[in-house]
Swiss-Prot record:
Phylogenetic lineage: Bacteria, Bacillati, Bacillota, Bacilli, Bacillales
Pathway assigned to this chain's UniProt record: Amino-acid biosynthesis; L-isoleucine biosynthesis; L-isoleucine from 2-oxobutanoate: step 3/4; Amino-acid biosynthesis; L-valine biosynthesis; L-valine from pyruvate: step 3/4
Catalytic reactions on record: (2R)-2,3-dihydroxy-3-methylbutanoate = 3-methyl-2-oxobutanoate + H2O; (2R,3R)-2,3-dihydroxy-3-methylpentanoate = (S)-3-methyl-2-oxopentanoate + H2O
Keywords, comma-separated and alphabetical: 2Fe-2S, Amino-acid biosynthesis, Branched-chain amino acid biosynthesis, Iron, Iron-sulfur, Lyase, Magnesium, Metal-binding
Name recorded for this polypeptide: Dihydroxy-acid dehydratase
Subunit comment: Homodimer.
GO cellular component terms given for this protein: cytosol
Cross-referenced Pfam families: ILV_EDD_C, ILVD_EDD_N
Free-text cofactor note: Binds 1 [2Fe-2S] cluster per subunit. This cluster acts as a Lewis acid cofactor.
Native organism: Staphylococcus aureus (strain NCTC 8325 / PS 47)
Family in the record: Belongs to the IlvD/Edd family.
Sites of N6-carboxylysine modification: K123
Annotated residues for binding of [2Fe-2S] cluster: C121, C194
Length: 562
């Protein structure tokens, strides 16, 4: 066993003495059993994580029943909804790297035989997956689960995106103070990840198709008995996989990454999944070309439109058959998925999901009646984004295939929000928000406030927004993010000026500023070099090492320093 490194031999008597002091070893034979880490992310200020202490206790009990010894440790977590709209958002994406580094440190320092990961919200899930790829120790994931959807006094279904859009609607005067307060009190009624197809739930669903989690991981409610039983079953399966030496890199292959993007397309997932899945591929040693994503989009139908793109919540999807029903439907179209690859269950993706039929065709559409013949995400290329940009086409009004407008440029999120709120931004504008990428932000902050304000003011079909920052999974409208290279790295988005005509072509997947190359070249000559906004602490180190979004926004040590 891997853990023999810390518990076998006379020279490890001091280590064994310390292990006895933990109280985790209940009998003389326990030292001969596998040591299993429980990588938890319990934290009081994140509603998606307040219940994870209870889930970890269930996992510990089940791991002991299965014949192994559990040891729990915790990682940090950032709630994107609470960190939104201020400098706290600078820490959200960078927290992913801290989580990965922290888990790697504990797992490798103590030579665990396996790891039970309990994530739930936005950056915690991908951070833990990065750690699993990096350490490549037998592992299983079981998330905390989504919260129930809220319900307003008027019987309207609510999610967190409803609340962000309500801010713009209230400022516009289209809802009353009483309606506003009612929504605030009822949008998030239970613990769990936010109820729509936002980043947290997108990633938790993707773990099913990647093969790292059990079926229904992405949709079973946080407060359900099914979630607690899933924790138990995952614990038993992990101990079995330790014995069989089934490792994360055996499961997460190039084909698994393809299938993750296919599910994302079918469910209209968050644009952040592109960023995180590219980072996962990088950590797994898989060279993954962005162009593959468009090829996957072309062959994958859009089957389930979930909040913020509709009123359906994750619970509605669960009741309609969950991710297994969507996977089963996609498997009926040859060439869409790679169903014969191994998963954490020890069975193939096909064996896990075959025969799981759709129970509600309003929530999950069949292959012969999709929302769209092509997937809900697109990668755009052009002279603004030579290395790519991302748009959630599933969140754009279906009548819009191209949008051309006049640029109105801002060098920060806050400047843009102020201009939208004071009505400087008008119909026909393309809002350009730059110097908000991984280096520029720093931390690639989410642009939910400006996009929600645009939609809340009734301009969702008349104003576009492009940025080298990113979006919340709750974002909808004509919103293009992850523009690469970012402005802070000298990307062409830095060259756009007010009044430039910009065309977003969803059909041809292009993003261009309609200016001659010689004009852009002259502008580049006078471009002021970017200076880091943060000079000390973690964000200063992050700024120095982080890459643009097209490579997943990962931290890389320059080759000349290795």
């Amino acid at each position: 066993m891997r853990s023999d490194m810390i518990k076998k031999g006379d020279h490890q008597a001091p280590a064994r003495s310390l292990l006895h002091a933990t109280g985790a070893l209940k009998s003389p034979t326990d030292m001969n059993k596998p040591f299993v880490a429980i990588c938890n992310s319990y934290i009081d200020i994140v509603p998606g994580h307040v219940h994870l202490r209870e889930l970890a206790d269930i996992a510990k009990e089940a791991i002991r029943e299965a014949g192994a010894i559990p040891f729990e440790f915790n990682t940090i977590g950032v709630d994107d909804g609470i960190a939104m709209g201020h400098i706290g958002m600078r820490y959200s994406l960078p927290s992913r790297e801290i989580i990965a580094d922290a888990a790697e440190t504990v797992i490798n320092a103590h030579w665990f035989d396996g790891v039970f990961y309990i994530p739930n919200c936005d950056k915690i899930t991908p951070g833990m997956i990065l750690a699993a790829m990096r350490t490549n120790v037998p592992a299983i994931f079981c998330s905390g689960g989504p919260m129930k959807a809220g319900l307003s006094a008027h019987g309207k279904a609510l999610t967190l995106s409803s609340m962000f859009e309500a801010v713009g609607a209230f400022k516009e005067g289209s809802i009353s103070k009483e309606e506003f307060l009612d929504m605030e009190q009822n949008a998030c009624p239970t613990c769990g990840s936010c109820a729509g197809m936002f980043t947290a739930n997108s990633m938790n669903c993707l773990m099913e198709v990647l093969g790292l989690a059990l079926p229904y991981n992405g949709t079973a409610l946080a407060v359900s008995d099914q979630r607690r039983e899933m924790i138990r079953q995952a614990a038993f399966k992990l101990v079995e996989n330790i014995k069989n030496d089934l490792k994360p890199r055996d499961i997460v292959t190039r084909e698994a990454i393809d299938d993750a993007f296919a599910l994302d397309m079918a469910m209209g997932g968050s644009t952040n999944t592109v960023l995180h899945t590219l980072a996962i591929a990088n950590e797994a040693g898989i060279d993954y070309d962005l162009e593959r994503i468009n090829a996957i989009a072309k062959r994958t139908p859009y089957l389930s439109k979930i909040a913020p793109s509709s009123s359906y919540s994750m619970h509605d999807v669960h009741e309609a058959g969950g991710v297994p029903a969507i996977i089963n439907e996609l498997m009926k179209k040859d060439g869409t998925l790679h169903p014969d690859r191994i998963t954490v269950t020890g069975k193939t993706l096909r064996e896990n999901n075959e025969g799981k039929e759709i129970k509600n065709f309003d929530v999950i559409h069949p292959l012969d009646a999709p929302y769209d013949a092509q997937g809900g995400l697109s990668i755009l290329f052009g002279n603004i984004a030579p290395k790519g940009a991302v748009i959630k086409v599933g969140g754009v009004d279906p009548s819009i295939k191209t949008f051309t407008g006049k640029a109105i440029c801002f060098n920060s999120h806050d400047e843009a929000v102020e201009a939208i709120d004071n009505r400087t931004v008008r119909a026909g504008h393309v809002v350009v928000i730059r110097y908000e990428g991984p280096k520029g932000g720093p931390g690639m902050p989410e642009m939910l406030a400006p996009t929600s304000s645009i939609v809340g003011r009734g301009l969702g079909k008349d104003v576009a927004l492009i940025t080298d920052g990113r979006f919340s999974g709750a974002t909808r409208g004509i919103a293009v993010g992850h523009i690469s290279p970012e402005a802070a790295s000298g990307g062409p988005i830095a060259l756009i000026e007010d009044g430039d005509e910009i065309t977003i072509d969803l059909t041809n997947r292009t993003l261009n500023v309609n200016q001659p190359e010689d004009v852009l070249a002259r502008r580049r000559e006078s471009l002021t070099p970017f200076k880091a906004k943060v000079k000390t602490g973690y964000l200063a180190r992050y700024t120095a090492l982080v890459t643009s979004a097209n490579t997943g926004g990962v931290m890389q040590v320059p080759e000349n320093l290795i």
